[in-house]
């Protein structure tokens, strides 16, 4: 495959002089080295057979013109008449129109719906789609090749893995986004659809370029007011924006809408008045949006209304909507995320992980053929590691789709770098061995394994108005990769990532290698410093889903239990002695999970309750593995900062600085995670770290041990989220606090870190002094910078570190920190750490 040589000086000049904020994502169409030879390798005109205004073919023309001009400076003309002459031409059409106009079909490969054929030879380019949407995908593919410097001749066809490739937005009518970390909604504000949908159009471009064909625009915890006539008109405007990109819109529904909006006094799915009401609503929507994709419903879960109120089945509920949609060709996506969040942990056999199979298996075959059951990838809730949901192996006669999460609800909320495809592939590549036959999850959701007509993919994305879309430039790799995987799930995670890097940051080899190394290390690192051995992400499940709080997993009805006590830990999900969850899997898989000696260590605590002293395959005990993994993960995160800093001057300053800020934050917050989890289990088990690290921090100065004026000690809760379990806060919200001490460290050059708490509801200010000389000043404004769910408490969510590098310190120097409170935030401090070169606290 021929790639044009990179003119390094020219490309560096381009990257340094063009400021980029991330809004274009991977569709930058940035200039590439292109001389006369390059121009000759490009077509000079575009012929689009039977293109109509507002069609995906017209969009393809616009993208080809914009892309080629942006990358090479060459302007492509558009032929006004249909012409099959390929000389110096990019011909784009549907297969049907090409056969009709050009009367030549001998060499066209067979394509599925949305598939395309791309053939390039010299400056002749042929793009044929089975549909107009497929032709648009082919145009984006050609532009992607050019953007990566690939001008080679190709001749290949590709078709989608599954017909449904949707994204879900959890946008609320007031403009907020549930589990969104990048600003308010691009669709809604103040109970209505926003008047300016320009960002929605840009989002449609990005989605179409990775072959997404459907979007649910509102939160699954839906508001019935979306169905007012005014808002239906607004939805039609959204559909008009997405239609030229081949994307059909759908909406999430509130099951009780016939009562709360329609005033019927009931929402019984078998009541004739309810059936009629939904039929009328559906007809009204299709009058406005003839190509509407369909509905998504969350019912009978987490307080959302559902058919169980009337002793009806989930199939009764799903079929209510499916039958209303069927005359219009719409799809009914029904979430399998149904469970009781008030179950009793004291009953050993209770298990939220059993809920999906318990609710849905008995209904297999009772759903209409346009219903797809949308199943989260694991049995609980988007954890850092879960086994495959057993429901995939228990629905033989029902269409299914997998639900992934691009938004990092439990995985660092875009403030921690976590490249997700390696995690997703542990699920999609897993062979469930149904009836002792190959039953790979990706083949189940495509419909191939059980011969189902529908199926596919859904991902919760939650972009916002932030210029980066997701809050973090590097998190966009997950959205790009999701689209690629939904089209072709056997694609390699590294190859997908590197295509995204070249499209997003250019073709500099050092940039490519560095971001690849960081990204591929990121999920293992996050798993290491959050939750190991299948114990789940040990975050605060009762509050933000962000920082550490392992105690929150237990003692409540939400069912994300660890059953940790002073001696042992883990869920016993065996049939023999536990909840029976292992028995929900096909026999070959059940045998593995039932037997502790066969269960892989990375899922040990998911399926087995063991003593902390249980030996793993590595020879380590469970508790020592916890300690070691948390230290290893945090150490990896520290390395992300110098790796990124090696890219200074190779990436434009705006994106470089924004990403460096997040990686520096992640390095500090990974230490918070490491210490919190290790201290919690050390305190619980009483078993010390054999390497003597946990609870031993010789380079720290605890704030409460310093001389305090205007500050007072404060017992932090959860206790483990503060070093030595204690912070200091100002004595009042109007009192300036001072903490000072004389340093006893050897003279030398140190990186000085200050761990503090940045609470929501105030922006305190701090100043750090050595011998009354200012080392640095900062403000507690992370809520304006980072975007994760904030906290009003001193805890693992608000805990944060700032570091001042290369500070010269002499033994006997006087350290002083002055904190000025603001609002409800009492300028809280945890500790100061003095790190010699090469030392990780």
Swiss-Prot record:
GO biological process terms, semicolon-separated: xylan catabolic process
Identify the domain of life.
Eukaryota
Single GO molecular function: alpha-glucuronidase activity
Family in the record: Belongs to the glycosyl hydrolase 67 family.
Write the Enzyme Commission number(s) for this entry. 3.2.1.139
Protein name in the entry: Probable alpha-glucuronidase A
Q: Which residues are glycosylated?
A: 50, 104, 223, 280, 311, 344, 466, 528, 577, 683, 724, 733
Coarse class of the protein's main subcellular location: secreted
Give the source lineage, highest ranks first: Eukaryota, Fungi, Dikarya, Ascomycota, Pezizomycotina
User: Keywords assigned by UniProt?
Assistant: Carbohydrate metabolism, Glycoprotein, Glycosidase, Hydrolase, Polysaccharide degradation, Secreted, Signal, Xylan degradation
According to the UniProt record, one GO cellular component term is: extracellular region
Extent of the signal sequence: 1-19
Q: Which organism is it from?
A: Aspergillus terreus (strain NIH 2624 / FGSC A1156)
Q: Which reactions is this enzyme annotated as catalysing? A: an alpha-D-glucuronoside + H2O = D-glucuronate + an alcohol
Function noted in UniProt:
Alpha-glucuronidase involved in the hydrolysis of xylan, a major structural heterogeneous polysaccharide found in plant biomass representing the second most abundant polysaccharide in the biosphere, after cellulose. Releases 4-O-methylglucuronic acid from xylan.
Subcellular location field: Secreted
**Classification via SUPFAM superfamilies:** (Trans)glycosidases, beta-N-acetylhexosaminidase-like domain
């Amino acid at each position: 495959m021929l790639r044009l040589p990179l003119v390094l000086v020219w490309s560096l000049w381009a990257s340094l002089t063009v400021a980029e904020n991330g809004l274009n994502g991977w569709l930058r169409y940035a200039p590439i080295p292109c001389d006369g030879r390059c121009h000759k390798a490009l077509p000079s005109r575009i012929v689009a057979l039977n293109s109509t205004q507002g069609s995906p073919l017209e969009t393809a023309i616009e993208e080809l013109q914009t892309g080629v001009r942006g990358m090479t400076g060459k302007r492509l003309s558009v032929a006004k008449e249909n012409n099959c002459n390929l000389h110096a031409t990019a011909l784009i059409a549907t297969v049907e129109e090409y056969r009709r106009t050009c009367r030549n079909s001998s060499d066209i490969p067979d394509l599925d719906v949305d598939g395309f054929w791309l053939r390039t030879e010299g400056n002749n380019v042929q793009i044929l789609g089975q549909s107009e949407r497929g032709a648009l995908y082919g145009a984006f593919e050609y532009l992607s090749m050019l953007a990566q410097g690939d001008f080679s001749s190709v001749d290949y066809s590709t078709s989608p893995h599954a017909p449904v490739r949707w994204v879900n937005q959890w946008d609320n009518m007031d403009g907020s986004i549930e589990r969104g970390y990048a600003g308010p909604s691009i669709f809604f504000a103040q109970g209505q659809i926003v008047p300016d949908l320009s960002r929605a159009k840009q989002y449609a471009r990005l989605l179409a370029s990775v072959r997404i064909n459907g979007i649910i625009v509102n939160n699954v915890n839906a508001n019935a007011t979306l169905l007012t006539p005014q808002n239906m008109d607004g939805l039609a405007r959204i559909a008009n924006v997405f239609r030229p990109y081949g994307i059909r819109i759908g909406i999430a529904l509130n099951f009780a809408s016939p009562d709360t909006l329609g005033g019927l006094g009931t929402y019984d799915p078998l009541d004739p008045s309810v059936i009629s009401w939904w039929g009328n609503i559906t007809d009204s929507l299709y009058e406005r949006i003839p190509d509407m994709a369909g509905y998504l419903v969350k019912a009978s879960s987490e307080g959302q209304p559902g058919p169980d109120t009337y002793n009806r089945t989930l199939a009764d509920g799903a079929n209510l909507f499916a039958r209303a949609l069927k005359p219009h060709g719409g799809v009914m996506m029904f979430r399998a995320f149904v469970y009781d969040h008030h179950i009793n942990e004291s009953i050993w056999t209770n298990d939220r992980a059993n809920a999906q199979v318990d609710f849905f298996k008995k209904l297999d075959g009772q759903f209409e053929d346009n219903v797809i059951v949308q199943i989260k990838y694991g049995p609980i809730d988007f954890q850092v590691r879960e086994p495959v949901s057993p429901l995939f192996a228990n629905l033989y006669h029902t269409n299914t789709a997998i639900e992934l999460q691009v938004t990092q609800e439990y995985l660092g909320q875009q403030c921690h770098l976590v490249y997700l495809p390696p995690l997703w592939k542990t699920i999609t590549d897993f062979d469930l061995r149904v009836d002792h036959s190959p039953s790979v999850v990706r083949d189940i959701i495509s419909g191939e394994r059980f011969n189902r007509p529908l199926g596919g993919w859904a991902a919760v994305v939650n972009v916002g108005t932030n210029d980066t879309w997701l809050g973090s430039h590097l998190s966009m790799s997950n959205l790009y990769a999701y689209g690629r995987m939904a089209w072709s799930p056997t694609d390699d995670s590294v190859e997908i990532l590197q295509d995204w890097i070249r499209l997003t940051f250019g073709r500099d080899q050092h940039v490519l290698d560095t971001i690849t190394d960081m990204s591929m290390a990121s999920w293992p690192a996050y798993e290491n410093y959050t939750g190991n051995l299948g114990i789940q992400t040990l975050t605060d499940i009762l509050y933000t889903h962000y920082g550490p709080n392992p105690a929150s997993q237990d003692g409540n009805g939400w069912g994300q239990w660890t059953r940790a006590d002073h001696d042992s830990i883990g869920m016993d999900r065996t049939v023999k002695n536990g909840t029976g969850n292992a028995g929900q899997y096909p026999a070959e898989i059940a045998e593995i999970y039932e037997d502790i000696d066969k269960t892989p260590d990375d899922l040990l605590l998911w399926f087995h309750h063991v003593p902390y002293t249980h030996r793993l395959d590595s020879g380590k005990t469970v508790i020592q593995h916890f300690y070691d993994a948390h230290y290893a993960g945090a150490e990896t995160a520290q390395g992300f900062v110098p790796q990124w800093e090696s890219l200074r001057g190779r990436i434009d300053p705006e994106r470089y600085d924004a990403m460096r800020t997040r990686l520096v934050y992640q390095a500090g917050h990974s230490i918070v995670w490491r210490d919190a989890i290790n201290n919690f289990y050390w305190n619980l088990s009483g078993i010390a770290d054999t390497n003597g690290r946990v609870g031993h921090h010789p380079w720290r100065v605890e704030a409460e041990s310093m001389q305090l004026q205007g500050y007072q000690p404060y017992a932090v809760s959860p206790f483990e989220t503060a070093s030595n379990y204690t912070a200091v806060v100002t004595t009042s919200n109007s009192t300036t606090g001072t903490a000072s001490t004389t340093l006893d460290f050897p003279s030398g050059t140190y990186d000085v870190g200050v761990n503090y708490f940045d609470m929501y509801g105030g922006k305190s200010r701090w100043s750090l002094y050595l011998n009354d000389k200012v080392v640095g000043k900062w403000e507690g404004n992370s809520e304006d910078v980072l975007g994760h769910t904030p906290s009003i408490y001193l805890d693992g969510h608000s805990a944060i570190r700032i570091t001042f590098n290369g500070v010269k310190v002499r033994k006997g120097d006087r350290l002083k920190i002055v904190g000025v409170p603001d609002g409800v935030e009492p300028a809280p401090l945890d500790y100061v750490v003095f790190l010699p070169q090469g030392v990780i606290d």
